[in-house]
Structures are given as C-alpha cells and as structure tokens.
C-alpha cells in the first residue's frame, strides 16, 4: 500500500474554502429558485384544471349532440 502524500496546508485550505463557498452558493441559489418553481407549478396546475374543465364541457356537448331527438 502506498503511504499518504503530504498536502500543503494552503492547498487544503483552498479545497475546503471552495467546498464551503460552493455549499453556500448552492443553498442561496436553491432558496432563490424554490419560490419560482412553486409559482410555476401553481400556474401549471391552474392551467391543467382549466383545460380539464374545457374538455369536460366539450365532451358533454358532444354527448348532447349524439343524444338529440332529431336523429
């Protein structure tokens, strides 16, 4: 087995600093994007509900035309 290599404290400091900065950036970015994603999901749900209602009405109208007395 190969013995561990001595790494400069400056390099260790740089690595851990980059790790911590990356984690902080990710947390900040996540908190920025989360409300936007929730808003997009809410809008998509409202749009889906509206389209489902239109399809239901269209289907009822088609059934009403098929069941008309004047056949």
Curated annotation (Swiss-Prot):
Residues with Phosphoserine modification: 68
Superkingdom of origin: Eukaryota
GO cellular component terms listed in the entry, alphabetical order: mitochondrial inner membrane; mitochondrion; proton-transporting ATP synthase complex
Family, as annotated: Belongs to the ATPase e subunit family.
Complex formation: Component of the ATP synthase complex composed at least of ATP5F1A/subunit alpha, ATP5F1B/subunit beta, ATP5MC1/subunit c (homooctomer), MT-ATP6/subunit a, MT-ATP8/subunit 8, ATP5ME/subunit e, ATP5MF/subunit f, ATP5MG/subunit g, ATP5MK/subunit k, ATP5MJ/subunit j, ATP5F1C/subunit gamma, ATP5F1D/subunit delta, ATP5F1E/subunit epsilon, ATP5PF/subunit F6, ATP5PB/subunit b, ATP5PD/subunit d, ATP5PO/subunit OSCP.
Function: Subunit e, of the mitochondrial membrane ATP synthase complex (F(1)F(0) ATP synthase or Complex V) that produces ATP from ADP in the presence of a proton gradient across the membrane which is generated by electron transport complexes of the respiratory chain. ATP synthase complex consist of a soluble F(1) head domain - the catalytic core - and a membrane F(1) domain - the membrane proton channel. These two domains are linked by a central stalk rotating inside the F(1) region and a stationary peripheral stalk.
Protein name, as recorded: ATP synthase F(0) complex subunit e, mitochondrial
Organism expressing this protein natively: Mus musculus
């Amino acid at each position: 087995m190969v013995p561990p290599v001595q790494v400069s404290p400056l390099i260790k400091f740089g690595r851990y600093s980059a790790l911590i900065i990356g984690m902080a950036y990710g947390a900040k970015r996540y908190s920025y994007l989360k409300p936007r994603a929730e808003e997009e999901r809410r809008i998509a749900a409202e749009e889906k509900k509206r389209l489902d209602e239109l399809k239901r009405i269209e289907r009822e109208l088609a059934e009403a035309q098929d069941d008309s007395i004047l056949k």
